[in-house]
A protein has these predicted regions:
Chain B
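Sec-dependent N-terminal signal peptides
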Residues: 4-14
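"Short basic amphipathic alpha-helical interaction patches in structured regions
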Residues: 129-131
Length: 300, 140
């Protein structure tokens, strides 16, 4: 029995050595090995480029939208958020992933407004979903404990929330669950858009309305990302929902000039192209209708 | 049959551990550079070989200060990165800034920018492979 276990372990060690050569975080290969691979080089390079496209992706975090809502002088409204009590009703990986993103955006919003108890509730709901989806990274008991310790410090809570979601995103990407990561991010974006739209409707010509209009650019990034996945059924529903939102956002007019780079008095580089996003009131109403309808479908 | 299952399970575990090293690299070596900034929730780290290049399109909001950190594992040569607008107009290159890994800037208005990352090929006998991470943080 011992010999059998030893032989199995030896195979593991040999193969592990091979895997380390191909996938360790910092290592070397000799170029002597390369000629044999030259025939496949082009296709392998293309495969690597495609793989990197699925990993390298970035849109602004929901916390950036939430901080603008607070900056504009609006107050916290608990009723706008997805109910934590619904967490147990979400079945299926796609719905769970989208709601994990939605709870993340609600968490960011609650953190920005110093709602510590709410943060704890939303973090617990997010953790429940993450556990149901077998995601061990990012949101776990140690983070919940950290959050409990930081009850009085808003910046620390924000830091914990954003780094937990970034880590969760990293965990999913590193465990070949990139599609789930895309759904979590889409859920967060959808919720942040819903919250911003609600406040934009209350205000008249505020910066929030402009920020909502600017989501035309963010959505373009997001849909570009979706196009890097060749026909993944789990993404189809969200992709068609995002396209429905894009149809409305396409009515937003964005004007821009040549990009300039200048230096501010404090020495920081300032980048700008004089770009302006303008959205008519009826477009905003149509956007709210479609966003509300899609959000309701996912949270109910 | 049981043996094969054990081998497969062990290999899967090893695969996860090696991939997870990029996450550890990001946490331990890259994120401390975002001190004072709120980290963006997207995760952008992958294994690069010498000569590899990648690009990410990002939207930055007007009126905000951003910090971009692009770092490679020390086994790699200094990672080059450029910031360009959507017309491919070069706005910043760390090659003109002593290969700095951190770039601070402010956006006058909301705009999409491209971040292009490249691990130079040193042409040596050894081909190095290591993690490359791009993170962004913002502050008001």
């Amino acid at each position: 029995m011992k010999t059998k276990i030893l032989s199995v372990l030896m195979v593991v060690v040999i193969l592990a050595g091979y895997m380390n050569l191909t996938s360790c975080s910092g290592c070397q290969k000799t170029k002597q090995d390369q000629p044999a691979m030259d025939n496949k080089k082009d296709s392998m390079d293309q495969a690597r480029v495609e793989q990197l496209k699925k990993i390298f992706f970035n849109i602004p975090s929901p916390v950036e939208m939430a901080s603008l809502i607070k900056k504009e002088g609006f107050s916290y409204d608990k009723k706008l958020l997805n109910k934590v009590e619904s967490v147990d009703t979400y079945m299926g990986e796609a719905k769970q992933a989208v709601n994990l993103g939605i709870y993340g955006a609600d968490l960011s919003y609650a953190s920005i407004f110093d709602q510590k108890q709410e943060c704890m509730k939303y973090f617990a709901a997010a953790k429940k979903l993450a556990t149901a989806m077998s995601i061990d990274g990012g949101i776990n008991d140690s983070i919940v404990a950290k959050l409990a310790e930081q009850q009085e410090n808003r910046d620390s809570i924000l830091k914990i929330v954003t780094s937990a979601y970034a880590d969760l995103n990293g965990y999913l990407k590193e465990n070949n669950r990139v599609e789930v990561s895309a759904l979590v991010i889409s859920g967060g974006w959808l919720e942040a858009l819903y919250l911003s739209l609600t406040y934009a409707e209350k205000s008249n010509g505020s910066a929030i309305k402009t920020r909502v209009a600017e989501q035309k650019m963010v959505l373009e990034n997001l849909l570009n990302y979706y196009s890097s996945f060749a026909d993944r059924p789990v993404l189809n529903e969200m992709k068609s929902d995002l396209l429905a939102i894009q149809k409305v956002l396409n009515q937003v007019e964005i004007t821009a000039q040549k990009t300039t780079v200048t230096k501010a008095d404090d020495g920081v580089m300032v980048i700008g192209n004089g770009g302006k996003a303008e959205m008519k009131d009826d477009t905003m109403k149509a956007l709210m209708d479609v966003v509300k309808q899609i959000r309701t479908k996912y949270i109910s | 049959m049981k043996k094969i299952a054990i081998v497969i399970l062990a290999l899967l575990a090893i695969g996860t551990i090696t991939q997870a090293q990029c996450r550890a690299f990001t946490k331990n070596r890259v994120l401390p550079n975002l001190l004072g900034y709120i980290q963006n929730e997207n995760y952008n780290a992958a294994l690069f070989m010498e000569g590899d290049e990648s690009e990410v399109l990002m939207t930055f909001y007007g009126g905000k200060n951003y910090r971009l950190v692009v770092m490679g594992h020390p086994v790699l040569p200094d990672v080059e990165f450029e910031v360009l607008d959507t017309n491919d107009e070069l706005l910043y290159s760390n090659k003109n800034a002593e290969n700095k890994t951190v770039f601070d800037f402010r956006m006058a208005n909301t705009q999409q920018l491209k971040v292009r990352v490249k691990v130079p090929d040193t042409g040596g006998t050894l081909v190095h492979q290591g993690c490359v991470t791009i993170v962004a943080g913002h502050k008001e």
